[in-house]
Amino acid sequence: MMNPSTILSALQWAEDTFGSVHLGDVRRTKRAVAIACAIAQEPAASLPAQLPDEAALEATYRFLHTPDVTYEQLIAPHIAQTRAEASKQQQVLLIQDTTEVDYQQHPTTTGLGPIGNGSHHGYLLQSVLAVVPESREVLGLMHQEPFLRQPAPKGETKRQRAQRERESQVWERSVQAIGTPPDGVQWIHVGDRYSDMFSFLSQCRQQQCDFVVRAAQDRCVDVLVEQANAPVPPRSHHRRRAGQPAAAQPQHLFEVVRGWSAVGEQDVHLEATKQTKARVAHVVLSFGCLRLLPPEHQQVSQGRPLVVWVIRVWEPEPPEGVEALEWILLTSVPTATLAQAWQRVDWYRARWIVEDYHQGLKTGCSIEERHLQSYEALRRLLGLLAPTAVRLLQLRAVARETPERLASEILPTDLVQVVALLAKVPAAALTAQQCWFAIARCGGYLRRRSSGPPGWKTLWKGWFYVQTLLEGVHLATRLSLN
């Protein structure tokens, strides 16, 4: 991650992130930096609000509609920086997820595709965030792909459907695009139930990466782990075989792991979702090693099973009226001890960071509120907003990860002085946590016992309110000097 001073300065951050972008003309590079700086100062605002100068605004619209500028060019320096940082770590989680970007309120934008149940239009976005496991430090985007949903042709046959590229293949493309880690570095792909595809898991191993995914498919398994990935005969593993020992008989994943006894227990904090509040769940855990047998069609695996460690986490006594938690996790990382099993669970729990990133992109950067003429123009804007949303996560982490650290050690002195006045705390004693909540209160956050951490809207509304006050202080200082 960049040092805090670079992250905190919109101009320094924009120059560091976009100053090396290759757009065929140095003037375009300068324009990219200028637009990114304006966006970084107030990410949730509209382009006219971010660029009040009419000439600068017109130049920005021309930039976003220039065919010679692409999303891939704009995002490339950020991806390269993230990869360089991820190559320095011993272990990195590559957390992957898909989200829908909805432009239903902008019906005149051309080139978009169907999303949801088909009644709305927009595009899909696959993001892979690089995160350090222990500290949860967000290094940046390792890969990102915006794409359009392709409706199935009318009258499509079963064979044609099998040959057509599937939307789910974006998970495999991401693994291929990221590739193999350097020697001595472990990259671990983390995904939810949508990532439970045999082809995705196989692709991770082909790229010498590991994985932790939540199981969705009740696959055929056996316990012949000593045979590793030795090919199994086509179709034979999908039916019981007479005359073979019980260990060699195919079984189903969920039935097997739900028969394992608990070997540990722990309290786990669950992040809030759209349907549920944040809570602490008391869970138990069991784990073991199995072989996942390949699908019947064989093409994705050449008949080779995958040896995986399976970790089941479940809530034996959930609160009344609350659905019990159960995660069945598959990992390629050898798991021999209880401590290692809990660590794999902790890796999976880091998944919320990519969801938070997408929320930051939508709420913190108002990506769905942007009104441009075409999907291609929106892609170019995404090339500027995607790293901006990473910066929002990193800005928040500066205060969250060191709550008792003095705010003056990580934030500009003048900003700390303004917040200290608002919080009615001496600037020299203001901690990062106090500063964080004082800024959020400026955005309407009410800190109650039942309240979770500040949301994107209140946090950034407060941040920009403080920035406005700070600009007023600077202006008043200049006027007094004159």
Labelled PLM ranges:
Residues 2-110, 117-124, 129-482:
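Single, function-defining residue in the core of a domain
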